Amino acid sequence: MQYSFTEKKRIRKSFAKRSIVHQVPFLLATQLESFSTFLQADVPTAQRKSEGLQAAFTSVFPIVSHNGFARLEFVSYALSSPAFNIKECQQRGLTYCSALRAKVRLVLLDKESPSKPVVKEVKEQEVYMGEIPLMTPTGSFVINGTERVIVSQLHRSPGVFFEHDKGKTHSSGKLLFSARIIPYRGSWLDFEFDPKDVLYFRVDRRRKMPVTILLKAIGLTPEQILANFFVFDNFTLMDEGAQMEFVPERLRGEVARFDITDREGKVIVQKDKRINAKHIRDLEAAKTKYISVPEDYLLGRVLAKNVVDGDTGEVIANANDEITEGVLEKLREAKIKEIQTLYTNDLDQGPYISSTLRVDETVDKTAARIAIYRMMRPGEPPTEEAVEALFNRLFYSEDAYDLSKVGRMKFNRRVGRDEITGPMTLQDDDILATIKILVELRNGKGEVDDIDHLGNRRVRCVGELAENQFRAGLVRVERAVKERLGQAESENLMPHDLINSKPISSAIREFFGSSQLSQFMDQTNPLSEITHKRRVSALGPGGLTRERAGFEVRDVHPTHYGRVCPIETPEGPNIGLINSLALYAHLNEYGFLETPYRKVVDSKVTDQIDYLSAIEEGRYMIAQANAAIGDDGALVDELVSSREAGETMMVTPDRIQYMDVAPSQIVSVAASLIPFLEHDDANRALMGSNMQRQAVPCLRPEKPVVGTGIERTVAVDSGTTVQALRGGVVDYVDAGRIVIRVNDDEAVAGEVGVDIYNLIKYTRSNQNTNINQRPIVKMGDKVSRGDVLADGASTDLGELALGQNMLIAFMPWNGYNFEDSILISERVVADDRYTSIHIEELNVVARDTKLGPEEITRDISNLAEVQLGRLDESGIVYIGAEVEAGDVLVGKVTPKGETQLTPEEKLLRAIFGEKASDVKDTSLRVPSGMSGTVIDVQVFTREGIQRDKRAQQIIDDELKRYRLDLNDQLRIVEGDAFQRLARMLVGKVANGGPKKLAKGTKIDQAYLEDLDHYHWFDIRLADDEAAVQLEAIKNSIEEKRHQFDLAFEEKRKKLTQGDELPPGVLKMVKVYLAVKRRLQPGDKMAGRHGNKGVVSKIVPVEDMPYMADGRPADVVLNPLGVPSRMNVGQVLEVHLGWAAKGLGWRIGEMLARQTKIEELRVFLTKIYNESGRAEDLESFSDDEILELAKNLREGVPFATPVFDGATEEEMSKMLDLAFPDDIAEQLDMNPSKNQVRLYDGRTGEPFERRVTVGYMHYLKLHHLVDDKMHARSTGPYSLVTQQPLGGKAQFGGQRFGEMEVWALEAYGASYVLQEMLTVKSDDVTGRTKVYENLVKGDHVIDAGMPESFNVLVKEIRSLGIDIDLDRN
């Protein structure tokens, strides 16, 4: 087995029983693939498929003018490279985007040409079409300097759907069937039955009309309509009664209304008897062709065709007329012999279309189309052209109606056609097929669709959403272009005069900036980033709304298996509407979710992997991943647990067609990170998944000792770590950069054989947490492609590490851990285990005001020396300054207008001169409740304004850093070149050279070492070929130098050009504060099993319960938090964590004893290879084994994969290995070694019973008490009621509500109550009076009228009630 550089350092022991058949796919693939398909940037123009931008362009172009003599054609498009890179965009608040240019061709036709059109002139030109935001390599977008994610949308697939109302519409509970044709864009077409069984249609949920109007409008006559939906009975009229053609199927189950006889007149069925199968056999045996029926059998039947008098041509009766005695008489008079009637019955052949025709009052096609026009455009006069145009535009025009590939495929599948392609508009037979199926459903044949089935819901990804917006922008452009194309010839316009890119830019900007699906990226930790990008939402434009979504949509559906996670979804109003993709899920070309399965052939499981969509999966029998398999791959058990069409059952192995890929297939990334998930209740697992996303990165991340084995995948795929792009040797490492000399076989000829990785240092994330990368390689290390070189936030040796491993004791402790409170040892705080760094960004802008420009300066009057001491000469705080609430960070003064001066001010001005009063101090100060260290300052200056010294210094530092990078590259490139040169020159014969090298001398190493490197090029070689090579190497080095100089110039130009700032802003300064947050009471913490709580007390180490060897517990949790919540996984995690740490202590003790390597190998083999997945320790050298052992001292990391984890036997084996009997005896453990005798830290007495003790990975969540704590003395008031505002953000007060008032009333504390309701709240005059009294030393309250009472009076008056206060 191949181990990567970081895996070798610390192997996670896996308890998985199954081998890895299929690797977890790249977790951000959905986003990245979707967007690259949209752009097709790297695809040559000729090979671009019709999707994304290409599809949008080809669907709108060519644009033809109204007169038809000018048209604008689309040729191709190209994307330029972005002006700024991602980091620069984030710093400057710009969008990371690329300019889109389209090559278009203007074709003008000759108006004079008599017959066919002749091209008069062609103009081709590249036109700017706006900016398209680009996706970063990690699947996010940088919009206006902040990272955003476009969430995928789960919406109803285009196609046709059949459903019924479940009997809710009509009081009788009758099922009313309906069908709906949903296009990708265009009008919806609904068909529905009413309680009287008449079939109606409606367009876009407008007024309903009988469906036959639509059928007539598409050109069918009533006769054709009936022929499409009914079978006919044939009658031959006799003088008395009639002969009916005998069709056996139609009689079965009917009650005979007369005696049925055979040819000889023998009675086969008596009157009023039900006709059964025997009667039909007898009739068939008698070779009955016709049955004689009495006259009244015909009455009430419905004619299928118009009946015309052969002689006169007069219509005697119309199709769909009921036969009455009068009609029969007319038929006989006209000597009509043959008639056809509709065959209907009550069971499976209802007269629905016939009854609908009776309701329909339109006569022909024109009348029907006019009726539809009136419904769509009420009040407009229907002219013939308008009527035709509207009807064709509804379903037949490609501009207005598009079923899309998916819609056509789904439609054809549903109506039972074989081909899955076809026209993208509706056809007449599509409408007929839909109505036929709907009538069949009403007749009791067939099934309605399940709209929550994932075969009927598809995912719209970034690419598709962006394409829709882009198309919308293009359509707006098309309208404008059409107007102007007419003047193109007369005014000699070029393509760029016709196209205005504003509508496109604004559509794209609006989508990326403010669409419901474009969200501010959750960047608390790497897991929250990945989960956000894998989120699937049913909300958003064209989706559901929270209020309207019922229970069914939110529920877990059998088709979610392996596609959407059944666990991870938010609590609250969005539950079930926002989901997460399952671990292996993948989108197919139509946007349906697929999941992988292993093929099973003849009861043998193969390694062939097939991705199946929800529709395909329904056809197969699929075994679960935990089915027992023999060595030859055969299914062993007699009965295997399996699923078919959503039902779970036990079947024999020969019926199995597929098998799950992995047990973790059904859950999402976050849920698959929970060890022992299978032992947790679903609700708690949901909380666990959601809370892992809120874990704050700790200062020193620590890998979980009990994981699930997916931690490395998550850390690497999230992009928070730094991975080697190419293999090589580490040439240089410091805290900020890693330089790697690339292996020769991976370096491309003529290119720099060096990779430089600049690490991200102390950068602010979207949630103000700290992103910081730390190198984990040393100089000289050999790394391969894909190896982790540096850890990011919340990663430890390339594994996700969200929290810390805490020694946990489950026991009550003096009520301090009552109701989920958490008791924590002071040592945890002292060791900075849960200390996190948060970075706050504070901005100040200097604007140009009416009274003159604001100025950023150090020169501020009446500012204390202490405050000024922190500012440099430009008035900006130094980096490294420690600041507290109220301290000045950036000095700024604003000019203020002349005011009427008081005598005191006049005196001051006379003494101190003018300066003091014409400006006011508007400096940037640290907000209340915040303190920290300044770690970075950025200054942005508008073009054309003099930079201050600080801004210049920042630019110089940046250039210096860049020059360092270039010098490094050059040093390695030259080193590499000179090594190659030396190998080439040694042993060659020279014709002369520096230091008087004689002709014919062989060059040796000593001679070269004696020469300066650059003089090697002056050696004249005898061998011409070698001389040419020497020249080539010299040229390539000079070329590289030239390239580097150009790159440096480019960078300098970028840095020294003015910054784009909002209008009116001259200068902007951003100050970054690093705030250190230690753990304190009130902080929220949680495990991974939904076991959350709040820190109630931090206890001195000496008071914590401790073990016999003096080790105190870190955390004490209440055992009552486990049984009722049914998240037993936490207890199992604690047991396994206890074993993991115990093994680590044993390895540490062996290393301390300096045990032989062989003994270490044996012990490690016992741990890794006795159970679960075996590891290949043989391939490790002794040094590697030693390094591995050193890294395991803090605990052997375990992986217990979801649904395939450690068993109780394996856990007890590990506990036995970790705690031999002598240690167990010393700690007074129970026989199963998972409980320990603890002693009370305060008294030293042992507790009565042993306590469950072990290690749990515990997280500190983002809900920190520092962010919630808030106090106010005076502050802002509400405008109308004059009461203090509420909430921390508004610096508001605490609400003294209704119940609090009752409490004071109950105590009779009338004075306290009075001041609460008046001067402390909204008595405006009273408030100022109190201040006045206090200043005078007179402690009296004059309570007046609360302002809210005046508001109430005004409100009563607004109701027209005259109310006045009698102020006596």
Curated annotation (Swiss-Prot):
Enzyme's top EC category: transferase
Pfam families from the xrefs?
Answer: RNA_pol_Rpb2_1, RNA_pol_Rpb2_2, RNA_pol_Rpb2_3, RNA_pol_Rpb2_45, RNA_pol_Rpb2_6, RNA_pol_Rpb2_7
The terms under GO molecular function for this entry are: DNA binding; DNA-directed RNA polymerase activity; ribonucleoside binding
Q: Which Enzyme Commission number(s) are on file for it? A: 2.7.7.6
Please cite one Gene Ontology biological process associated with this protein.
Answer: DNA-templated transcription
Name the GO cellular-component terms: DNA-directed RNA polymerase complex
Q: Which UniProt keywords apply?
A: DNA-directed RNA polymerase, Nucleotidyltransferase, Transcription, Transferase
Keyword Ribosomal protein present in the record's keywords: the answer is no
Determine if Nucleotidyltransferase is one of this entry's keywords: yes
InterPro entries referenced in this protein's UniProt entry, alphabetically: DNA-dir_RNA_pol_bsu_ext_1_sf, DNA-dir_RNA_pol_bsu_external_1, DNA-dir_RNA_pol_su2, DNA-dir_RNAP_su2_dom, DNA-dir_RNAP_su2_hyb_sf, RNA_pol_bsu_bac, RNA_pol_bsu_CS, RNA_pol_bsu_protrusion
- What does the record give as the reaction this protein catalyses? RNA(n) + a ribonucleoside 5'-triphosphate = RNA(n+1) + diphosphate
Query: Looking at the record's lineage, which domain of life comes first?
Result: Bacteria
Q: Which Gene3D superfamilies match?
A: 2.40.50.100, 2.40.50.150, 3.90.1100.10, DNA-directed RNA polymerase, beta subunit, external 1 domain, DNA-directed RNA polymerase, subunit 2, domain 6, RNA polymerase alpha subunit dimerisation domain, RNA polymerase Rpb2, domain 2
What is the role of the protein in this entry? DNA-dependent RNA polymerase catalyzes the transcription of DNA into RNA using the four ribonucleoside triphosphates as substrates.
Q: How does it assemble?
A: The RNAP catalytic core consists of 2 alpha, 1 beta, 1 beta' and 1 omega subunit. When a sigma factor is associated with the core the holoenzyme is formed, which can initiate transcription.
The record's comment on protein family reads:
Belongs to the RNA polymerase beta chain family.
* UniProt protein name: DNA-directed RNA polymerase subunit beta
Which organism's genome codes for this protein?
Answer: Burkholderia mallei (strain ATCC 23344)
Question: What gene name is given for the protein in this entry?
Answer: rpoB
